[in-house]
Amino acid sequence: MDYKKIIKDNYTLHLIKTDRFKTINIGLKLTKEYNKEEFAYLNLLARVLPINGTKNYKTVNDITKKLESLYNTGIYFKSLQTSKNMSFEASLRIVNPKYTEKSMYKESISMLKEIITNPLIKNNEFNYFDVTKNNLINNIKNIKDNFFKI
């Protein structure tokens, strides 16, 4: 296993090279000081991006079909909070290109980039923003309602 840490002005890149696995995980983590209101938006962003569609893949079905054509590549988003920081994570799980076509690696990274940088936006909003916001509010209410029943 080879480990390399590259520190730049605005980011730190961690590279771990190993040939023990048949899948490759690539992650992007953006971290900043915790802010309650911004964290709510980060949480919504992590929930909206995978289902929203993009300029080139208009529906979640289009995204799913493309990911399946890339040997069921997985793309995941989440928001995390610690006492002082909050972060947004995007990760990609792909089959090691040595077992597939060489172009698959580049196509998978392009798909992650497409979802992050080209979301489908109409009237200055994500397609599923209101639905996702209401689902999140209901989840929070359910946690509060069920907390005392445990």
Model-identified regions with their sequence ranges:
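M16 family metallopeptidases and their MPP-like homologs
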Residues: 16, 22-42, 60-114, 145-150
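Short N-terminal helix-initiation segments at or just after the protein's N-terminus
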Residues: 26-37, 55, 130-142
